[in-house]
Each structure stands twice: as C-alpha cells, then as structure tokens.
Amino acid sequence: MNNKMISVNQRDYAWPRQPLVVVCIDGSEPGGEGSDQGGYIERAIDAGQTPFLASLREKATFGYADCVVPSFTNPNNLSIVTGVPPSEHGICGNFYYDTDNDVEVMMNDPSLLRAPTILAEFNQAGAKVAVITAKDKLRRLLGVGLDIAGGSAVCFSSELADQATLSEHGVEGIVDRVGMPVPDVYSAELSEFVFAAGVVLMKSMRPDIMYLSTTDYIQHKHAPGTPVANAFYAMMDQYLTRLDAMGVTIALTADHGMKAKHAPAGEPNVIYLEPLLGEAGLTEFRVILPITDPYVVHHGALGGFATIYLDNDSDHARARAAFDGVPGIETVLTRNEACNVFGLPADRIGDLVVISTRDYVLGSAPEKHDLSGLKDPLRSHGGLSEQRVPFIVNRCLEACATGRRNFDIFSHTLNHALEGSS
C-alpha cells in the first residue's frame, strides 16, 4: 500500500489507493429540510431513474454538506480543489471589482488564484490528473500548476473540446474519441460530454485523480422531480455506473443548490439595489453582482448575493438602512462581518454585502438586466438558502467531524474511506 501523504494548504491528503473521481454537479439542489421540491438526486431515485445513486443511498455514503457563500460556481469549484475557503484561495465570485485598476472583470484569470490546488500538488508529486469542465470559464483556473507539457495531466472543457490540443490541454481528437459532437453551451449535452469524456479517459489514461465539473443549465430551467431533470440525472447515473465498474472511488458534491425565485404567475422576484440606494439619497456607490458571467440565459445575472462599494465612509449607515424592512432581504453585512462569517478575501469584497431570502434575487437596476433569455420561471442561487449541497461517496467513510463542507470532499474521501467498502 502507498502510505504517501501530500500536504496542500495546511491539509494532509493520503495518496489514492485507486483512481478517485470527484464530481461537482453544478446547481444540484439536495433533498432534506428546506429543499426545493425534494432535491434532484432524491427525486430521481424515488422515480426509479437512478439505480446506481439509489444503491449509494442504501449502502455507501449519502449525506450533505455546506458550500461556500456566495453560493456561486467559481468560488466553490476553487474551494473544492484547494480544500480551503475563498479567504485563502482568493476567488470570491464569478465576477468582481478590481479596485486597483478601477475595472469590473470576470474572475477567470489564473493570476487571481492565491493558493495551489490539490490537483496540481498531486500531479507535481507524480500523480496522473485529468480535469474536464463543462464551461471553459473554469478550465484555466482549475488547470493552474498542472504539468500538461509533461504528459501527466489533461485539462479541457466540453464547450471547446474541438479546440483541445496536446500542447495546451494534454489531449487531442477528444471529440472523435468520445463520439459526440461539441454540444451547445445551453444544453444538457454539455454536461453529458464531461461524463462521456471522463469514461474515455479513465479507460485510456486511468488517472489517479479526475475532477469533473458540470453546468447547471438544466437546474436553472427545471425543478427537481420534473421529467427533464430526472432524465438528466438518469444520464449521469449511467456514466457513474460505468466508472464504478472500473474500480474507482467516486465522490459527488455540488458548488451550490438551486431555488425557485419567481412569483406564482412566473415573473421573477427581483430586488433592484441601485434604486433603493438612490431613494436613500446616495449617489456615489457601485453595486457588484458576483453571479455575473457570460451565460445570462441561465439566470439573467440575478442571484442571491451582492456587494456594494461606497465612495464615502460616512454613507455606510445610511446605505445599510436603505434595505431595512425590504421584503426579500435576508441580511446586510459589513465587509468585516461578511469576511468573518463566510471566509472571504477582504480586498475583493465591497463595503457591504446584501443577501436575499430563498424566494428572491438581487439586481442592480432594471435597465441593466436583459431578461429576454429567461424563457422559464427564474431559478437561481447565491445566498444562504442555496448553501446545502450533496456529499455522496461510493465508499463508506469513517466518522468525520460535523460541520462538513463541500471542500472537505477530497480530504474525507482520500483520508477516511474504508477499504473494501462499496
């Protein structure tokens, strides 16, 4: 047995005894108390659509954990692969305000990452690593530190799979090998390609560690238990069954949950922050919505978490009071409060943080949001109500401390999986 341990960001990880596949199921709202319509996986199991996941609920590890707040894609994927909160790795949203350069930018550049990843540290210690994402926006961040040129790592997205090259991605011809056309970015097939490619690489490369990250296009459009949602999880179940048959350890979690954010008639429940601040007499401020990314058809840049920059320190109390008693506002925190509670980097967060309740989302101003792409009642995420996520492993785990987080998935699976369990 290999007793080698790898230390990453002050956490120790055992060398995998068999290949480990960690899957981040984007937007996978879980079941249990406070869930939206019973949870995606649970409803699919109850409908008889996912026999493999049903077997894990019966005889393996089937539980829950908390994700990072803001409950968005980038901060949580990077927390999962670094094992630490955003206060340490620096990625606190999909989008942020660069105060040094006075510019609002997508948080996709590898230079923004402040901590090494578990993937890179294992790769540099001799492990073969494969990373497959649905959206290309995550690829460069997740691939930081991987030895692509040395041939021991692969990192590509299904979105741009036809552009994958040996020199930049560690693989070529993957579209032909998978046998699927490059999917549309707004499709279930974008995630299916991730799983299909994962099976192909597990057969040909057999990496020691594989990280698969899907897209939440389906979850934004379809509630748990609906036919389309159940079909999506049935597809995923089939690929997980094939991976399990290859003798790998499979660990599933999510970057965030997903809740309905609309009124009974279907119109979105939006609180626009700029008009409220204006009504309070404020003029010098900047509202940042960290959910912002290029894929506005998913959510219209409307999420449950916003941060506000104020030009004048004297405006703090008045700005905070602007949201008093507003229906749909769950909490308003100062920068220090938010960083202490949620583990966020203080230099990348505004003076105030606003979080909405489970039924509402936050916007900047009506004219700044193009909602024409929202063909279905809005479902979104970002706040405390989407913090609970699945934590599922096809092995039994030793008893672990309470307060489990999604970014504990590597630690718990590598360090606490019971040998021979399945």
Feature-to-residue mapping (PLM):
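A short acidic-Thr-Gly-centered motif at the start of a beta-strand
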Residues: M1-R17, D244-A245
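Metal-dependent active-site segment of extracytoplasmic phospho-/sulfohydrolases and closely related
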Residues: V21-V22, F52, A231-L277, V354
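Short catalytic/ligand-binding loop motif for oxyanion handling, primarily in non-cytosolic enzymes
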Residues: P30-G32, T73, H89, K137-G143, ...
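Short, structured active-site-proximal loop/turn typified by the sulfatase FGly-forming signature C/S-X-P-X-R
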Residues: E33-G83, K128-A130
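Anion (oxyanion) recognition and catalysis
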Residues: R57, N123, D244-A245
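His/Asp/Glu-rich, glycine-adjacent segments
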Residues: V81-A223, A229, H298, G304, ...
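Acidic/histidine-rich catalytic neighborhood
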Residues: T241, M258-T307
